[in-house]
Regions:
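Short, low-complexity N-terminal intrinsically disordered segments enriched in polar/charged residues
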Residues: 1-38, 143
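Exposed beta-sheet edge and beta->alpha loop/turn motif
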Residues: 92-120
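A short hydrophobic beta-strand element
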Residues: 82-95
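A solvent-exposed, acidic/Ser-Thr-rich amphipathic alpha-helical stretch
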Residues: 29-83
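A short, polar/proline- and glycine-enriched secondary-structure boundary/capping micro-motif
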Residues: 97-99, 136-141
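Short beta-strand edge/turn micro-motifs at domain boundaries
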Residues: 86, 110-138
Length: 143
């Protein structure tokens, strides 16, 4: 039996993080659930804290309704520590509402962000997402 090293665990967690972000980008609202503890926490710097899978799913559903073609894509930059990892990603979607001006409806925006994931073994118990509230509009306006 092979010994589970810190590097092995970090590698497996990176695979889980990539799969989790793939699930956030998918159409199945319960897709991310398999990576999260039932009592896990999702914190978003803009959207606040959501405790437990039902609250996380409701927040995710709201985001998917607003941006049906949302894509969260890890850049490949990961940093690990014994209880988790941090990662960079891009988020993109098509602007569907005119809250930033009717001239921007139908345009695709792309923003950068960073997350850290805390694990219990290979299960995410906390995800914290950081991104700039003004970056979506800057992307749409070419700034």
């Amino acid at each position: 039996m092979a010994e589970n090293t810190d590097a092995d665990l970090a590698g497996r967690r990176i695979e889980i993080a990539a799969a989790l972000f793939g699930a956030w980008s998918g159409g199945d609202l319960d897709g991310p659930r398999r990576y999260f503890a039932e009592d896990g926490v999702l914190y978003d710097i803009i959207g606040g804290e959501h405790r437990g899978w039902p609250a996380i799913r409701a927040y995710f559903e709201h985001g998917r309704q607003r941006y049906p073609d949302l894509v969260l894509e890890p850049t490949g930059d990961f940093w690990s520590r014994p209880d988790g990892l941090a990662m960079l990603w891009t988020m993109s979607a098509t602007q569907a509402k005119d809250d930033l001006g009717p001239e921007l409806v139908g345009r695709r925006w792309t923003v950068e962000g960073m997350s850290y994931l805390i694990f219990d073994g290979l299960t995410v118990v906390r995800e914290a997402d950081y991104h700039d509230a003004g970056s979506r509009e800057r992307s749409l306006r070419g700034g």
